[in-house]
Amino acid sequence: MRFVTCRLPDGVEDPAILSQDGTQVWPLSWLGLSYETLSGAIPFLTPQVRAGLQLAIAGIPALPVDAVQLQSPIPCPAQDVVCLGINYMAHSDEAEKYSADAFATKHQDAIYFSKRVSRAVPDGGFIEAHTDLVQK
């Protein structure tokens, strides 16, 4: 069972269940669950609750996914997001062109870093370039 956050046609943002094929959503509010966010729902989505939800969605119509705007699953994380720098070396090589001293040491270990997020950009969403700060 896959959970998403979506903006409904009336503009309300609601956690929802995404169908197996990714073409339909069932807002949790339609199932009588009044969680404002997916973060609020997660602690209560026990295996028993998920099994009950699976039965419930089998009996009610869904919204086509094209009728909603998919958001980030957790649009406003309560904490910093921890990231794994898989492509750290590529960034290091690129940054070394600008400051060889700062990136002269090559790291072989995994690089973790955190990001502050006020609101996560949804899949396919616009990422502001901050052209006043950077050129590329």
List the predicted regions and their residue ranges.
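Active-site glycine-rich loop that binds ribose-phosphate moieties when present
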Residues: 120-134
